[in-house]
Amino acid sequence: SMNTKIGDVWNSVPKEVDMQQHDWGVSEALRYRFTKELLGKASVSYDVRLPTDAELIGDGFLIAPSGDLKPERGTNANIGLMYDKKIGSGLLQVEVNGFFSYLQDMIRYTRNFVQGRYTNFGEMRTFGVEAEVKADVTRWLYGYVNATFQDLRDTRKYEPTSNVLNPSKGLRMPNIPYFLANAGVEFHKENLFGGKGQNVRLFTDASFVEEYFFDFEVSQYQEKRIPRSFKLDLGLEYSIMNGGLTFSAKASNLTNARLFSEFNYPPPGRAFTARIRYVLK
């Protein structure tokens, strides 16, 4: 339920909003262990996601209110396999998942000249697969790699509030990456410099996002694209007193690569941060 007043930069008189909605959802999941190392899992669900406060009433500046938003309704299915195996003193884990989603009344951010707002987009269908491998390579070295491919398509037959055929039906959804991958390596060692109660972590993480469209690809000459990106982070953590005192430092976007958000905004470039954490016991 919501009882409030909303307005935007164009309207000086706030509009009263008083509404109450009810809905339901259902889900079921199961898993089956084929062997000691191999686990299968599956789930189906009909979910309802209520709009958040930010989506409904905006932020009073860049995001205009949208008091008439409907909840998202999604029919989802997932199926996957997980392989766990001890290797020496460590663990090898391999996981593969496939997923499907049919979303109605999808809540999507739409940019305007001055203010953007969240609107109910309509219908969207998703097929996808994701895979991840994690392993303790040695007692002091850990690594992981994962990748996701997802095919999200507009399934609206008509344009909103009209009988005009939707020219983007069947096209890939814009502003959402369809292929992305991550990888990382971590070195960790206890009492590397002698003594007791110490731990050192040196880690690096890399992320890759393939080029994707800023808007619907309604023409083969569509050039509004969000470019391919690669980001590399490097961090160091040193703790003493059995984790009671921790010093950490991190370099984000170490190579100062040009990155862009899903709406083609450039985020900050290379950044360095440092933290000290003390735990009271």
What are these regions, as identified by a protein language model?
Residues 22, 30-33, 46, 71, ...:
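Residue-level signature of outer-membrane beta-barrel architecture
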